[in-house]
Structure formats: structure tokens, C-alpha cells
From Swiss-Prot:
Keyword Oxidoreductase in record: no
Entry's localization field: Virion; Host cell membrane
Name under which the protein is recorded: Matrix protein
Domain of life: Viruses
């Protein structure tokens, strides 16, 4: 049985929206580079120069003899670095990078990125830029099927998104814990509703924001579980959630991310599941890659957050990764 509990909008009023990147072009049609700075935190970190950097751009043919042919729109997450440089100067250096892109495959399709340009201001992000990086193609590209293999490709940076890490630490919940299932436990999930306003160009105004499209995504926080074989009631779980004093914000980790901070009391079991952290980060890049790509340049804001209490999925249930093809019979087989 599923129970739903609505959070008061005051829990996300301050840091709920993200401003869009409005596309503007030069006279020849090329996009004008822009930078966006997001601060989803409350400002209690002593070191104010830590930031997460995320690049957006065009995957195009690397042909010095003619005008480049754009193949797809892509992104390159650079991760966390420390810098006191102005965002505009960081953007300028990023647009001068010579980033090579290569399409390959592993468990799924991949994109490989590596940079051939010496770094100065972007040195704090050298591990990704100099050493190279590989990503799930669907997480960082909107149309990987259009990227050819027989023509060298480059990633031309157009936009930069910087997320200032002003909170005293963000914690990404380990994947094993997110997949943890327990007998007689109540799963605590969040259903987040976003209102999306795509970048439609400068000077254009949406008269009725209520008519803008909405999208939802769901994240798993943890499980409420009693030591005995009994199950907590929904009302008791709701009381525990209210005591946590959750505050929500949107950031730019991996594109768009949900940031959660507990300002109250958290149950010992749940606190342990979350690595004894009270400031959490859930990148949509990992949760819902399709929605994340849609939000790369869009204005969006939180309009509703609901706690969803559900029975934990039984451990005997098989997940998709446990299904293989039986070579003997040519049929799907559940291990």
C-alpha cells in the first residue's frame, strides 16, 4: 500500500528555481558562449571557492578545412575544483579547449573525451580534461546515434554551468544503498514535480506560467525498519519525516540535481544508511537521464515535493540485470 505525504512549499521556496540559459547567436549563426552560476546551499562552508563545473556544447566534425558540421548537443561534467577566478574567465578558457570526442561501447554506448590544450585557470579540473574521461553516452549526449565513427569529432564548448558548493559538504548516497531492500521495511521515496520553461529566446514572455509543462522524478532516500518482524505504520513514518526538517534546492551537479538538507532529527537507522550525512545530492544524470538532458538549458523550478511511503521491494524479486539469454534454448532465463 502506498501512502503520500505533501511537504510545505516553504521547504524549497528559496532555492527551488534554476534560471535558464537563453540562447543568443552571432551574425553568422554561432551560439554566443554563456556561463550560469547556481548556489543551492545555505552558505555554512568556510571555504567559498569550491565549485562543480559542467560544460555544454556541440559535438561536431573536426575538419580544419571547412565549416564544422554539428552532429549532436552534448555535455562534459568536469567535477569539483577550487578556484577564485571569475566565471567569465573560466568560460573563456573553456571555449578555447581542443576536446576530442570518440564514440565507443562497453556494457552500453560510451563517449570518450580528452583535451589537447594546456590548462591555466582550469588546472583544478585537470584530472578529467588531461587524463580523459568516459561516460555513458545517453547521459552526456542527446543524439549519440548521429555521431559518426569514420570522421574525427570534437566537443566545442558553448555554455558553462557552475554550482557553488557553499554548504558544508554534499554527499552522494552510494548506489548499493539506493538498491538496498529489506524485509518488513517501509521505503521512503520522494516524488518531485518540476515546472519546465524551455529557453525560448530573449524578450519572449510566457503569460500563464501555470500552463508550462511539468515533469516528475523519484528518488529513494532510505528505509524505515524495525528491529522486530513488525512494520512501522505510515503515520509513524510521516512523524519521523516531519522531525527531519528537510529543506530542498536545485543545483547543477551533472546537469540538474536535487539537494536535500536535514535541519532536524533523523532516525539512527536512516542516518546510518545515508553514511551519517545530513546534506545529500541526487544528480538527475543518474536518476533520470532523459529528463536531465531536457533540463540542460531550461528554466525549471520545484512546484511540489511529496514523500512516498511504500513497502520495500522483497529481496526475492529479480531485477533486470538477473535476466540473461539461455544459450541452449534461445530463451530468456531468470537466474
Amino acid at each position: 500500500m502506498t501512502e503520500i505525504y505533501d511537504f510545505d512549499k516553504s521547504a524549497w521556496d528559496i532555492k527551488g528555481p534554476i534560471a535558464p540559459i537563453q540562447p543568443t547567436t552571432y551574425s553568422d549563426g554561432r551560439l554566443v558562449p554563456q556561463v550560469r552560476v547556481i548556489d543551492p546551499g545555505l552558505g555554512d562552508r568556510k571555504d567559498e571557492c569550491s565549485m562543480y563545473m559542467f560544460l555544454l556544447g556541440v559535438v561536431e566534425d573536426s575538419d580544419p578545412l571547412g565549416p564544422p558540421i554539428g552532429r549532436a548537443f552534448g555535455s562534459l561534467p568536469l567535477g569539483v575544483g577550487r578556484s577564485t577566478a571569475k566565471p567569465e574567465k573560466l568560460l573563456k578558457e573553456a571555449t578555447e579547449l581542443d576536446i576530442v570526442v570518440r564514440r565507443t561501447a562497453g556494457l552500453n554506448e560510451k563517449l570518450v573525451f580528452y583535451n589537447n590544450t594546456p590548462l591555466t585557470l582550469l588546472t583544478p579540473w585537470r584530472k578529467v580534461l588531461t587524463t580523459g574521461s568516459v561516460f555513458n553516452a545517453n547521459q552526456v549526449c542527446n543524439a549519440v546515434n548521429l555521431i559518426p565513427l569514420d570522421t574525427p569529432q570534437r566537443f566545442r564548448v558553448v555554455y558553462m554551468s557552475i554550482t557553488r558548493l557553499s554548504d558544508n559538504g554534499y554527499y552522494t548516497v552510494p548506489r548499493r544503498m539506493l538498491e538496498f531492500r529489506s524485509v518488513n521495511a517501509v521505503a521512503f521515496n520522494l516524488l518531485v514535480t518540476l515546472r519546465i520553461d524551455k529557453a525560448i529566446g530573449p524578450g519572449k514572455i510566457i503569460d500563464n506560467t501555470e500552463q508550462l509543462p511539468e515533469a516528475t522524478f523519484m528518488v529513494h532516500i532510505g528505509n524505515f525498519r524495525r528491529k522486530k518482524s513488525e512494520v512501522y505504520s505510515a503515520d509513524y513514518c510521516k512523524m519521523k519525516i516531519e522531525k527531519m526538517g528537510l529543506v530542498f534546492a536545485l543545483g547543477g551537479i551533472g546537469g540538474t540535481s536535487l539537494h536535500i538538507r536535514s535541519t532536524g532529527k533523523m532516525s539512527k537507522t536512516l542516518h546510518a544508511q545515508l553514511g551519517f550525512k545530513k546534506t545529500l545530492c541526487y544528480p538527475l544524470m543518474d536518476i533520470n537521464e532523459d529528463l536531465n538532458r531536457l533540463l540542460w538549458r531550461s528554466r525549471c523550478k520545484i512546484v511540489r515535493i511529496q514523500a512516498v511511503l511504500q513497502p520495500s521491494v522483497p529481496q526475492e524479486f529479480r531485477i533486470y540485470d538477473d535476466v540473461i539469454i539461455n544459450d541452449d534454448q534461445g530463451l530468456f532465463k531468470v537466474l
